[in-house]
Amino acid sequence: MVQLPIIDMVKTGQNIIYLRQQRGLSVKDLQDVFGFATPQAIYKWQHGTTMPTIDNLLVLAMIFQVHMDDIVATVD
């Protein structure tokens, strides 16, 4: 039987922080790109509390110039 991947939300959040910093972007910059009234969603992504939607993951991948697989981490 195929072993299905399990998303590691904390590691995914760490990837978002790392990739954001590599691009020289602030949380406010991402907030503006997404048009969020507050930065709370981005902080929740970064802390592994919630995951970005598929649509938002696609935008993050475009902004960071990586594949979505480079953002989402799975449990080994």
Locations of the language-model features?
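DNA major-groove recognition helix of helix-turn-helix/homeodomain DNA-binding modules
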Residues: 55-70
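Short, charged recognition helix plus adjacent turn
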Residues: 1-6, 62, 72-76
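Short alpha-helical DNA-recognition segment
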Residues: 24-44
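The alpha-helix within a helix-turn-helix
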Residues: 20, 31, 61
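Residues within the helices of the helix-turn-helix
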Residues: 17, 28, 58
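DNA major-groove recognition helix of helix-turn-helix
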Residues: 45-46, 56, 75
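A short, Lys/Arg-rich alpha-helix, primarily the initiator
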Residues: 1-23
